[in-house]
Swiss-Prot record:
It comes from Homo sapiens (Human). In contrast to the mouse or rabbit ortholog, the IMPACT locus is not imprinted in human. It is found in: Cytoplasm. Keywords: Actin-binding, Cytoplasm, Differentiation, Neurogenesis, Phosphoprotein, Repressor, Stress response, Translation regulation. This is Protein IMPACT.
Amino acid sequence: MAEGDAGSDQRQNEEIEAMAAIYGEEWCVIDDCAKIFCIRISDDIDDPKWTLCLQVMLPNEYPGTAPPIYQLNAPWLKGQERADLSNSLEEIYIQNIGESILYLWVEKIRDVLIQKSQMTEPGPDVKKKTEEEDVECEDDLILACQPESSLKALDFDISETRTEVEVEELPPIDHGIPITDRRSTFQAHLAPVVCPKQVKMVLSKLYENKKIASATHNIYAYRIYCEDKQTFLQDCEDDGETAAGGRLLHLMEILNVKNVMVVVSRWYGGILLGPDRFKHINNCARNILVEKNYTNSPEESSKALGKNKKVRKDKKRNEH
């Protein structure tokens, strides 16, 4: 290792230790070897109105001759606001070339959030809208970025026919084997559910895990069979990954599963996957449904999917 590299490495380690000491649990290590870190920043620790996740990767040349590579992740941050904040961070780097700047960046972002909280109130419908090209967090990210937004879709009444025990009981949650493709990681989580309240309970429990809470997207779908009405109560959530929730629910319909919910967490790694991301989301879900015996073997499930595609093609052919 060159002398300059050794010096940079030492300075990076000292800065990382300082950030961990200053910010405690707010600072987290995503990939120690790749020097990727993330910190959750808010306007107020006790009662946050605005929150943002800053992800940084420290190149070998930092802090000597190169800035940290950074990403900003917040559901409300877009357009001119994002550009202004990025310009502010880059200006700090230019004014402090050769110096450690992570602390300055964090406190600048905090100042922006405090100013924003004094000027405006967060809207009632603020929710994740991070598209694939936005910022995200990777495999071992463990910091929360306002997961409550994903729970808003679950404000419905509980059926009076459900017992109090059913309503209050948190079902067991299983976690599938992650799928990683081009630095994006997908992992499915499954729980048996018999009422909407349990859906909300499962989501709340999952969000206690900081890694899951800070996933770029937590897509979910559930199907509950109502025996008295012989109908299904079902719903889904994209969590910013457009159409992913509907595709996941459609998969569950094809597989004819019932009384189960599946959540698929995605940690975006900075490389666009295009349509492959939907394939990975559904594969994660199908794998765990098969593993937990909610459907047939992988081979039979594949046949069911193929049959459904054929039916759709035949239907389209007949329409012409």
